[in-house]
C-alpha cells in the first residue's frame, strides 16, 4: 500500500468514526423506557449528576409543569388503570390521581433550619440521595407514580420506577409523560426511567444495582421484606388492616356516612381504608341501619357464609375478586344483586372471622359488636396486628379518642371522618400514597427522600 492509498484509508476510517452515532449512552426505546435494568439505571445516574447542578427553581418548574400538563390526563389515566388492572373504579381513581397531583408538596417541604450561638452557626438542609428505586403497586399504580415523582424530583433525585406487571401499560405511559415534562423544563433526559418489561426479576436486579441509593417500596410485606435484604436504605410501605371503632357517644349519622364513603372508596383498595368495624353493642343496630340508608347491603348469615367461601377460600383472599365491585362479589357467590347496586357489603361476624383478621382489599366490611369502649380498643389493637398503619375512630369523647390514638400508635389516626381524610382527601394535610409503616417514616413527602446535612460556621455569625 503506497502513501496515497494509506492516506485515503485513514480519511475513510476517520470519516466513518465521525459520522457514526456513539453507542453510549444507551438511548431508551421510548421516553425513559429502556430494554435493560442496567441501561435504565445508568441513564438515571447520569441524569442525576446533571440535575444536581440545577437550582431549586428548576425543580419547582418541573413540578408546576406536571400539575398543569397532567391535569387533563387524570381521568383517562384513571380509566386505563381500572381497565388494565381489573380493580377499583375510574371515578375514585381519578380522585386519587387528582389528590396526588394537587396535594403532594414540592420543594417547599425541604425546610432549612439554622441554629446560632456564641460558637457560630449551624445550618441543616436537605440534599438528594441520588437514584431512587421506587416500586409501585397494581392497586394504586398511577397515583403512586405521580406522588413519588413529585416528592423525589422535588428532593433532587432521579427515579427508576419498578411498576407492577399488572399495571404495565398505564404505568409506562405515565412514566414517559413525566420524563418528557421534566426534559422540557430542564433539558435533562432520563430523570424518570423504567424498563419496557417490568418483572419480578427486573425488580430484583434494580434492588441489587450499586447505583440505586435508596429503595422506596409501596406494596405488600413480601416485596418490602425483599427490599430489606438488599442492604440499602429502605423506605417501606407495607400492608395495613385498619380497624374502625364506633363508641356510644358518636354521631351515628355522620359516622355511618363516613364509614361507607371510606370503606367503599375505590372498592376498598387503599391500604388506609376501613377493613373492619368494631362498634359498641348499645348503638350497633342504629349504626347498621344508618349505614343501609347510605347504600350498604346487610348480608344474612347464610349469604355471609356463601360470600366467605368464594372470596376467602381457606381464609385467604381470592385474588380474582380483589378490588371488584360489591355486585361482582355477590354474583360470584351466587347471591342475588339488588336492583339498586350496593355501595358496600356489610355483615355481622365474630372477632375471629377471616374478614376481620387480615387485609382483604374488597368492599365487604365486617361488623363486630363489643360490650364497651375498652373491649373495642382491645380488639382494634389485636386486629391492627401491630402494623402501625392506620386506624379510624368515631366518638365525641376526646379522652377516648386520645387514648385510642396513643394505644394504637398508627402512622395515621383519623378521628370522626372517612379513612381517606388521613391522606389529605377531604381532610387537612398533604397527600401521599407511600405510607412507610414498617420502616417508620410514616406519611412520606419530599423531605423523606432527602438526607439531612449539617453545615457549621464557627466563630460568630450570631447577631443577637
From Swiss-Prot:
Gene Ontology terms: biological process: propanediol catabolic process
Misc. remarks from the entry: Bacterial microcompartments (BMC) 100-200 nm in cross section are formed during aerobic growth on minimal 1,2-PD-B12 or anaerobic growth on 1,2-PD-tetrathionate medium, but not during aerobic growth on glucose, anerobic growth on glucose or pyruvate-tetrathionate. BMCs can constitute up to 10% of total cell protein.
Cell location: Bacterial microcompartment
Protein name as it appears in the record: Propanal dehydrogenase (CoA-propanoylating)
EC assignment: 1.2.1.87
Regulation: induction: BMC production is induced by growth on 1,2-PD vitamin B12 medium.
Record InterPro entries: Acetald_propionald_DH-rel, Ald_DH/histidinol_DH, Ald_DH_C, Ald_DH_N, Aldehyde_DH_dom
Family per record: Belongs to the EutE/PduP family.
